[in-house]
Amino acid sequence: MPHRDQPKTAHVTTRRLLDMKQQGEKISMLTAYDYTMARILDRAGVDVLLVGDSASNVFSGHSTTLPITIEEMIYHAKAVVRGVHDETGRAMVVIDMPFMSYQLSSEEALRNAGKIMKEHECDAVKMEGGHVIVESVKRITDVGIPVMGHLGLMPQSIYKYGSYRVRAQEEQEAEQLLRDAELLEKAGAFAIVLEKIPSALAAQVTASLTIPTIGIGAGVACDGQVLVINDILGLNREFHPRFVRQYVDLNSMIEQVARQYVTDVRGCDFPSSNESY
């Protein structure tokens, strides 16, 4: 049952993340898609929970993040927010704006960002892109909705890239990424995710901004790090990118438990008299 009477700790805000950057305190961020995991991660002290459009991959089995809808994202976000609320209430909750929920126009972007914020008590939205979305970011932040940016490898643009290789290795793309980061900050973004870019470039971006950077495959110089929870738990045995640190092989553990359960049921070892009424 939820521990609604347990002491609450100070909720992580955009201001707190800025303070953490200034104080040299690293920011921890993980994805969360459901109530139970959100409670566990909040209790563990994770600073930011990202309701990622990666739910399209790890929950629905799609090969890309593109198919997930705004309604599906809101469903996951509501569960995560409830989980944080029923634990310490500390973690910030950020939700990805899914593909084509903000690309058509700044007006459409504002409408959908407002819909997301109104339907659950999340803290911010996250958007992929640089100069092409700056107008939308400014319009959204101007009405009081915090926006986290995302540069480098942008999964919603995977068909444009053609692969998940490291981005901004060439000088022209690296210079554009630097400009985009500065534009996002000026537009009002409170933080920027840097995905799969050279460590030296990530360090340069981090040093050039007053807002925090959160890396995924972008080196240790970023102000924080983010990973997909399923990846660090080893739930996907086919996915082992270089930037992921797998802390446990939960895939094998769950399979072992399930096999033992099947054996116990078939052998009439479960339920025992102690597990019956």
Swiss-Prot record:
Its cofactor is Mg(2+). This is 3-methyl-2-oxobutanoate hydroxymethyltransferase. One of its GO terms (cellular component) is cytoplasm. It holds the Pfam family Pantoate_transf. The active site is at E195 (proton acceptor). Belongs to the PanB family. The gene is panB. Disulfide bonds: none annotated. GO terms for biological process: pantothenate biosynthetic process. Homodecamer; pentamer of dimers. 3-methyl-2-oxobutanoate binds at D53, S54, D96, K126. It is found in: Cytoplasm. Its EC number is 2.1.2.11. Mg(2+) binds at D53, D96, E128. It comes from Chlorobium chlorochromatii (strain CaD3). Pathway: Cofactor biosynthesis; (R)-pantothenate biosynthesis; (R)-pantoate from 3-methyl-2-oxobutanoate: step 1/2.
